[in-house]
Amino acid sequence: MTDRKNGLTYADAGVDIDAGNRLVDLIKPMVRATARPGADAEIGGFGGLFDLKAAGFKDPVLVAATDGVGTKVKIAIEAGLHAGIGIDLVAMSVNDLVVQGAEPLFFLDYFACGKLDPVATAAIVAGIAEGCRDSGCALIGGETAEMPGLYTDGDYDLAGFAVGAAERGTLLPGKDIAAGDAVIGLASSGVHSNGFSLVRKIVERSGLGYDANAPFSPVMTLGGALLAPTKLYVKSCLRAIRETGAVKGLAHITGGGFTDNIPRVLPPHLGVGIDLPRLPVLPVFKWLAEQGEIAELELLRTFNCGIGMIAIVRADAVEQVSDILTEAGETVCLLGEVIEAKGEHRVVYSGHLDLAW
Protein backbone atom coordinates (compact mmCIF):
# COMPACT_ATOMS: atom_id res chain seq x y z
CA MET A 1 0.00 0.00 0.00
CA THR A 2 1.40 3.38 -1.00
CA ASP A 3 2.00 5.96 1.74
CA ARG A 4 0.87 9.47 0.85
CA LYS A 5 3.12 12.15 2.26
CA ASN A 6 0.35 14.71 2.73
CA GLY A 7 -2.50 12.26 3.32
CA LEU A 8 -5.04 13.11 5.98
CA THR A 9 -5.80 10.94 9.00
CA TYR A 10 -8.88 10.62 11.20
CA ALA A 11 -6.89 12.40 13.92
CA ASP A 12 -6.38 15.35 11.54
CA ALA A 13 -10.17 15.61 11.40
CA GLY A 14 -10.32 15.80 15.20
CA VAL A 15 -11.22 12.20 16.08
CA ASP A 16 -8.78 10.38 18.35
CA ILE A 17 -9.36 6.62 18.19
CA ASP A 18 -6.55 6.02 20.68
CA ALA A 19 -8.30 8.26 23.23
CA GLY A 20 -11.43 6.15 22.77
CA ASN A 21 -9.45 2.99 23.43
CA ARG A 22 -7.92 4.53 26.56
CA LEU A 23 -11.41 5.35 27.78
CA VAL A 24 -12.55 1.75 27.29
CA ASP A 25 -9.60 0.51 29.34
CA LEU A 26 -10.45 2.97 32.12
CA ILE A 27 -14.12 2.06 32.34
CA LYS A 28 -14.03 -1.73 31.94
CA PRO A 29 -13.61 -2.41 35.70
CA MET A 30 -16.42 0.06 36.51
CA VAL A 31 -18.76 -1.60 34.04
CA ARG A 32 -17.84 -5.10 35.21
CA ALA A 33 -18.83 -4.15 38.77
CA THR A 34 -22.47 -3.72 37.64
CA ALA A 35 -22.88 -7.42 36.77
CA ARG A 36 -26.09 -9.05 38.03
CA PRO A 37 -28.00 -12.28 37.39
CA GLY A 38 -28.72 -12.25 33.66
CA ALA A 39 -25.74 -10.14 32.58
CA ASP A 40 -21.97 -10.39 33.00
CA ALA A 41 -21.55 -6.66 32.15
CA GLU A 42 -18.61 -7.24 29.82
CA ILE A 43 -18.23 -4.59 27.12
CA GLY A 44 -16.43 -4.63 23.80
CA GLY A 45 -18.80 -6.69 21.68
CA PHE A 46 -21.22 -5.42 19.06
CA GLY A 47 -24.21 -5.75 21.38
CA GLY A 48 -25.06 -6.35 25.02
CA LEU A 49 -26.72 -9.57 26.18
CA PHE A 50 -29.26 -10.26 28.92
CA ASP A 51 -30.74 -13.60 30.00
CA LEU A 52 -34.26 -13.15 31.41
CA LYS A 53 -34.44 -16.71 32.71
CA ALA A 54 -31.22 -16.31 34.66
CA ALA A 55 -32.75 -13.19 36.23
CA GLY A 56 -35.57 -15.34 37.63
CA PHE A 57 -38.51 -14.14 35.57
CA LYS A 58 -41.25 -16.58 34.56
CA ASP A 59 -43.74 -14.58 32.47
CA PRO A 60 -42.21 -11.11 32.18
CA VAL A 61 -43.42 -7.96 30.49
CA LEU A 62 -40.52 -5.77 29.38
CA VAL A 63 -40.62 -2.04 30.14
CA ALA A 64 -38.26 0.42 28.42
CA ALA A 65 -37.37 4.04 29.12
CA THR A 66 -34.97 6.61 27.71
CA ASP A 67 -34.02 10.07 28.92
CA GLY A 68 -31.23 12.60 29.24
CA VAL A 69 -30.09 15.15 31.80
CA GLY A 70 -31.09 18.31 29.95
CA THR A 71 -29.17 21.53 30.41
CA LYS A 72 -27.91 20.43 33.83
CA VAL A 73 -24.99 19.25 31.69
CA LYS A 74 -24.13 22.89 30.97
CA ILE A 75 -23.69 23.61 34.68
CA ALA A 76 -21.52 20.49 35.07
CA ILE A 77 -19.31 21.71 32.21
CA GLU A 78 -19.02 25.27 33.55
CA ALA A 79 -18.41 24.09 37.13
CA GLY A 80 -16.04 21.30 36.08
CA LEU A 81 -18.02 18.79 38.15
CA HIS A 82 -18.97 15.74 36.11
CA ALA A 83 -19.31 12.66 38.35
CA GLY A 84 -22.91 13.20 39.48
CA ILE A 85 -24.18 13.61 35.92
CA GLY A 86 -23.77 9.87 35.38
CA ILE A 87 -26.00 9.09 38.36
CA ASP A 88 -28.56 11.58 37.02
CA LEU A 89 -28.58 9.81 33.68
CA VAL A 90 -29.38 6.44 35.22
CA ALA A 91 -31.93 7.83 37.68
CA MET A 92 -33.99 9.58 35.03
CA SER A 93 -34.65 6.29 33.25
CA VAL A 94 -34.76 3.71 36.04
CA ASN A 95 -37.09 5.86 38.17
CA ASP A 96 -39.44 5.84 35.18
CA LEU A 97 -39.27 2.03 35.13
CA VAL A 98 -40.10 1.55 38.80
CA VAL A 99 -43.23 3.71 38.54
CA GLN A 100 -44.58 0.95 36.32
CA GLY A 101 -43.66 -1.70 38.86
CA ALA A 102 -40.68 -2.89 36.82
CA GLU A 103 -37.30 -4.01 38.12
CA PRO A 104 -34.47 -2.41 36.11
CA LEU A 105 -32.43 -5.07 34.32
CA PHE A 106 -29.92 -3.34 32.06
CA PHE A 107 -28.77 0.08 30.94
CA LEU A 108 -26.94 1.54 27.94
CA ASP A 109 -25.57 5.04 27.51
CA TYR A 110 -24.79 7.35 24.60
CA PHE A 111 -22.11 10.01 25.10
CA ALA A 112 -21.29 12.63 22.45
CA CYS A 113 -18.60 15.31 22.62
CA GLY A 114 -16.46 17.65 20.54
CA LYS A 115 -13.11 16.38 21.85
CA LEU A 116 -12.85 13.25 23.96
CA ASP A 117 -11.18 13.64 27.36
CA PRO A 118 -10.78 10.05 28.61
CA VAL A 119 -10.33 11.02 32.27
CA ALA A 120 -13.34 13.38 32.47
CA THR A 121 -15.49 10.95 30.51
CA ALA A 122 -14.43 8.08 32.77
CA ALA A 123 -15.67 10.15 35.74
CA ILE A 124 -19.08 10.37 34.08
CA VAL A 125 -19.12 6.63 33.37
CA ALA A 126 -18.14 6.00 37.01
CA GLY A 127 -21.33 7.83 37.98
CA ILE A 128 -23.34 5.79 35.48
CA ALA A 129 -21.90 2.58 36.94
CA GLU A 130 -22.68 3.74 40.49
CA GLY A 131 -26.26 4.51 39.50
CA CYS A 132 -26.59 1.09 37.89
CA ARG A 133 -25.23 -0.69 40.97
CA ASP A 134 -27.53 1.27 43.28
CA SER A 135 -30.58 0.40 41.17
CA GLY A 136 -29.62 -3.21 40.55
CA CYS A 137 -29.19 -3.04 36.78
CA ALA A 138 -26.25 -4.03 34.60
CA LEU A 139 -24.43 -1.58 32.35
CA ILE A 140 -24.19 -3.76 29.24
CA GLY A 141 -23.03 -1.32 26.60
CA GLY A 142 -22.86 2.19 25.25
CA GLU A 143 -21.60 4.49 22.53
CA THR A 144 -18.98 7.22 22.75
CA ALA A 145 -19.11 9.60 19.79
CA GLU A 146 -16.42 12.21 19.21
CA MET A 147 -17.95 14.75 16.82
CA PRO A 148 -15.74 17.78 16.13
CA GLY A 149 -17.60 20.53 14.37
CA LEU A 150 -20.94 19.49 15.85
CA TYR A 151 -19.87 20.04 19.47
CA THR A 152 -17.22 22.52 20.59
CA ASP A 153 -14.24 21.30 22.61
CA GLY A 154 -15.34 20.79 26.21
CA ASP A 155 -19.03 20.41 25.38
CA TYR A 156 -20.84 17.10 25.60
CA ASP A 157 -24.30 15.58 25.87
CA LEU A 158 -25.51 12.18 26.92
CA ALA A 159 -28.59 9.97 26.87
CA GLY A 160 -29.52 6.78 28.66
CA PHE A 161 -31.64 3.76 27.81
CA ALA A 162 -32.98 1.33 30.41
CA VAL A 163 -34.98 -1.87 30.18
CA GLY A 164 -36.76 -3.51 33.09
CA ALA A 165 -39.30 -6.25 33.63
CA ALA A 166 -42.29 -7.10 35.76
CA GLU A 167 -44.20 -10.33 35.98
CA ARG A 168 -47.39 -10.20 33.96
CA GLY A 169 -50.26 -8.90 36.08
CA THR A 170 -48.10 -6.87 38.46
CA LEU A 171 -47.61 -3.70 36.41
CA LEU A 172 -48.47 -0.28 37.82
CA PRO A 173 -50.57 1.78 37.96
CA GLY A 174 -53.20 -0.61 39.23
CA LYS A 175 -56.75 -0.45 37.93
CA ASP A 176 -58.06 -0.21 41.50
CA ILE A 177 -56.99 3.37 42.26
CA ALA A 178 -59.98 5.00 43.93
CA ALA A 179 -61.07 8.18 45.68
CA GLY A 180 -59.83 8.11 49.26
CA ASP A 181 -56.48 6.49 48.49
CA ALA A 182 -53.59 8.27 50.18
CA VAL A 183 -50.96 10.37 48.39
CA ILE A 184 -47.49 9.93 49.91
CA GLY A 185 -44.43 11.97 48.94
CA LEU A 186 -40.83 10.73 48.93
CA ALA A 187 -38.24 13.46 49.47
CA SER A 188 -35.93 14.54 46.66
CA SER A 189 -32.20 15.21 46.92
CA GLY A 190 -32.41 18.59 45.19
CA VAL A 191 -33.43 19.95 41.81
CA HIS A 192 -32.81 16.52 40.20
CA SER A 193 -32.56 16.78 36.39
CA ASN A 194 -35.26 19.06 35.04
CA GLY A 195 -35.95 22.78 35.00
CA PHE A 196 -32.29 23.69 34.52
CA SER A 197 -32.87 26.14 31.69
CA LEU A 198 -34.82 28.20 34.23
CA VAL A 199 -32.24 27.50 36.95
CA ARG A 200 -29.45 28.82 34.71
CA LYS A 201 -31.51 31.93 33.91
CA ILE A 202 -32.02 32.57 37.63
CA VAL A 203 -28.31 32.08 38.40
CA GLU A 204 -27.48 34.55 35.62
CA ARG A 205 -29.90 37.07 37.14
CA SER A 206 -28.38 36.57 40.61
CA GLY A 207 -24.91 37.51 39.36
CA LEU A 208 -23.31 34.57 41.19
CA GLY A 209 -20.75 32.21 39.71
CA TYR A 210 -21.01 28.46 40.13
CA ASP A 211 -17.88 28.58 42.30
CA ALA A 212 -19.52 30.99 44.78
CA ASN A 213 -20.90 29.73 48.09
CA ALA A 214 -24.51 28.62 47.67
CA PRO A 215 -26.72 31.17 49.53
CA PHE A 216 -29.05 28.33 50.59
CA SER A 217 -26.21 25.96 51.58
CA PRO A 218 -23.08 27.93 52.56
CA VAL A 219 -20.93 24.81 53.03
CA MET A 220 -21.27 24.03 49.31
CA THR A 221 -20.53 25.91 46.13
CA LEU A 222 -23.54 26.96 44.08
CA GLY A 223 -22.50 24.60 41.30
CA GLY A 224 -22.02 21.68 43.67
CA ALA A 225 -25.40 22.24 45.33
CA LEU A 226 -27.29 22.52 42.04
CA LEU A 227 -25.55 19.40 40.72
CA ALA A 228 -26.67 17.16 43.61
CA PRO A 229 -27.45 13.85 41.85
CA THR A 230 -31.02 12.77 41.21
CA LYS A 231 -32.28 10.38 43.87
CA LEU A 232 -32.69 6.73 42.92
CA TYR A 233 -36.02 5.40 44.20
CA VAL A 234 -35.81 1.91 42.71
CA LYS A 235 -34.90 -0.34 45.63
CA SER A 236 -37.12 1.38 48.20
CA CYS A 237 -40.17 1.49 45.94
CA LEU A 238 -39.77 -2.10 44.74
CA ARG A 239 -39.55 -3.21 48.35
CA ALA A 240 -42.74 -1.32 49.27
CA ILE A 241 -44.56 -2.70 46.22
CA ARG A 242 -43.55 -6.30 46.87
CA GLU A 243 -43.88 -6.42 50.65
CA THR A 244 -47.23 -4.65 51.03
CA GLY A 245 -49.28 -5.06 47.86
CA ALA A 246 -50.75 -1.69 48.82
CA VAL A 247 -48.92 0.61 46.40
CA LYS A 248 -51.40 1.30 43.61
CA GLY A 249 -49.41 3.82 41.61
CA LEU A 250 -46.20 5.86 41.49
CA ALA A 251 -45.40 9.13 39.74
CA HIS A 252 -41.84 10.33 39.09
CA ILE A 253 -41.88 14.12 39.55
CA THR A 254 -39.81 15.51 36.68
CA GLY A 255 -40.62 18.12 34.02
CA GLY A 256 -44.20 19.25 34.57
CA GLY A 257 -43.90 18.94 38.34
CA PHE A 258 -46.88 17.74 40.36
CA THR A 259 -49.38 19.37 38.04
CA ASP A 260 -48.57 17.34 34.94
CA ASN A 261 -47.03 14.13 36.29
CA ILE A 262 -49.50 12.89 38.90
CA PRO A 263 -52.47 12.73 36.47
CA ARG A 264 -50.44 10.42 34.22
CA VAL A 265 -51.02 7.52 36.64
CA LEU A 266 -54.68 8.23 37.43
CA PRO A 267 -57.88 7.15 35.67
CA PRO A 268 -59.52 10.06 33.79
CA HIS A 269 -62.26 10.54 36.40
CA LEU A 270 -59.86 10.95 39.32
CA GLY A 271 -57.53 13.65 40.60
CA VAL A 272 -55.59 14.38 43.77
CA GLY A 273 -55.86 16.95 46.51
CA ILE A 274 -52.46 18.17 47.76
CA ASP A 275 -52.07 20.07 51.04
CA LEU A 276 -49.17 22.38 50.19
CA PRO A 277 -48.13 23.30 53.77
CA ARG A 278 -47.21 19.61 54.24
CA LEU A 279 -44.72 19.71 51.38
CA PRO A 280 -41.13 19.95 52.72
CA VAL A 281 -39.75 22.57 50.33
CA LEU A 282 -35.96 22.32 50.10
CA PRO A 283 -33.92 25.53 50.58
CA VAL A 284 -32.70 25.46 46.96
CA PHE A 285 -36.29 25.90 45.74
CA LYS A 286 -36.92 28.73 48.19
CA TRP A 287 -33.87 30.52 46.82
CA LEU A 288 -34.86 29.89 43.21
CA ALA A 289 -38.40 31.11 43.90
CA GLU A 290 -37.12 34.30 45.51
CA GLN A 291 -34.40 35.10 42.98
CA GLY A 292 -36.60 34.29 40.00
CA GLU A 293 -39.78 35.77 41.47
CA ILE A 294 -41.48 32.55 40.42
CA ALA A 295 -45.22 32.25 41.01
CA GLU A 296 -46.28 29.33 43.20
CA LEU A 297 -48.17 27.48 40.46
CA GLU A 298 -45.22 27.90 38.08
CA LEU A 299 -42.92 26.47 40.73
CA LEU A 300 -45.21 23.46 41.16
CA ARG A 301 -45.34 22.84 37.42
CA THR A 302 -41.58 23.21 36.88
CA PHE A 303 -39.75 21.71 39.86
CA ASN A 304 -40.15 18.82 42.30
CA CYS A 305 -40.05 21.36 45.17
CA GLY A 306 -38.64 18.70 47.53
CA ILE A 307 -40.67 15.62 46.53
CA GLY A 308 -39.20 13.47 43.77
CA MET A 309 -41.65 10.56 43.82
CA ILE A 310 -45.35 10.27 44.62
CA ALA A 311 -46.96 7.04 45.79
CA ILE A 312 -50.68 6.32 45.63
CA VAL A 313 -51.36 3.97 48.52
CA ARG A 314 -54.37 2.16 49.95
CA ALA A 315 -55.56 4.36 52.83
CA ASP A 316 -55.39 1.63 55.48
CA ALA A 317 -51.76 0.83 54.59
CA VAL A 318 -50.20 4.29 54.85
CA GLU A 319 -48.29 3.49 58.04
CA GLN A 320 -47.08 0.12 56.75
CA VAL A 321 -45.85 1.54 53.43
CA SER A 322 -44.31 4.59 55.12
CA ASP A 323 -42.43 2.40 57.61
CA ILE A 324 -40.95 0.24 54.84
CA LEU A 325 -39.93 3.27 52.78
CA THR A 326 -38.36 4.88 55.85
CA GLU A 327 -36.44 1.69 56.67
CA ALA A 328 -35.18 1.75 53.08
CA GLY A 329 -33.77 5.26 53.59
CA GLU A 330 -36.57 7.45 52.31
CA THR A 331 -37.98 10.55 53.97
CA VAL A 332 -41.74 10.26 53.63
CA CYS A 333 -44.70 12.59 54.18
CA LEU A 334 -48.46 12.31 53.69
CA LEU A 335 -49.48 15.00 51.19
CA GLY A 336 -53.16 14.38 50.51
CA GLU A 337 -55.58 11.95 48.90
CA VAL A 338 -57.13 10.84 45.64
CA ILE A 339 -60.36 12.71 44.84
CA GLU A 340 -63.03 12.74 42.15
CA ALA A 341 -61.86 15.01 39.33
CA LYS A 342 -63.83 18.20 38.82
CA GLY A 343 -63.26 19.91 35.50
CA GLU A 344 -59.85 20.13 33.87
CA HIS A 345 -57.87 20.67 37.08
CA ARG A 346 -56.91 17.19 38.27
CA VAL A 347 -54.35 18.32 40.85
CA VAL A 348 -56.09 20.53 43.39
CA TYR A 349 -53.84 22.48 45.74
CA SER A 350 -54.88 23.78 49.16
CA GLY A 351 -52.91 26.24 51.27
CA HIS A 352 -49.51 27.54 50.18
CA LEU A 353 -45.91 26.39 50.03
CA ASP A 354 -43.65 27.49 52.87
CA LEU A 355 -41.08 29.51 50.92
CA ALA A 356 -39.61 31.45 53.85
CA TRP A 357 -35.89 30.91 54.43
From Swiss-Prot:
For this protein, the record's CDD domains field holds: PurM
Q: In which pathway does it act?
A: Purine metabolism; IMP biosynthesis via de novo pathway; 5-amino-1-(5-phospho-D-ribosyl)imidazole from N(2)-formyl-N(1)-(5-phospho-D-ribosyl)glycinamide: step 2/2
Q: Which SUPFAM superfamilies match?
A: PurM C-terminal domain-like, PurM N-terminal domain-like
What InterPro entries does UniProt report for this protein, alphabetically? PurM-like_C_dom, PurM-like_C_sf, PurM-like_N, PurM-like_N_sf, PurM_cligase
For biological process, the GO terms are: 'de novo' IMP biosynthetic process; adenine biosynthetic process
Where in or outside the cell it occurs: the entry states: Cytoplasm
GO MF, one annotated term:
phosphoribosylamine-glycine ligase activity
Q: Which reactions appear under catalytic activity for this entry?
A: 2-formamido-N(1)-(5-O-phospho-beta-D-ribosyl)acetamidine + ATP = 5-amino-1-(5-phospho-beta-D-ribosyl)imidazole + ADP + phosphate + H(+)
Any idea which UniProt keywords this protein has?
A: ATP-binding, Cytoplasm, Ligase, Nucleotide-binding, Purine biosynthesis
Q: Which Gene3D superfamilies match?
A: PurM-like C-terminal domain, PurM-like, N-terminal domain
Q: Could you state one GO cellular component term attached to this entry?
A: cytosol
Indicate the family of this protein: Belongs to the AIR synthase family.
Q: What is this protein called?
A: Phosphoribosylformylglycinamidine cyclo-ligase
Q: Which organism is it from?
A: Rhodopseudomonas palustris (strain BisB18)
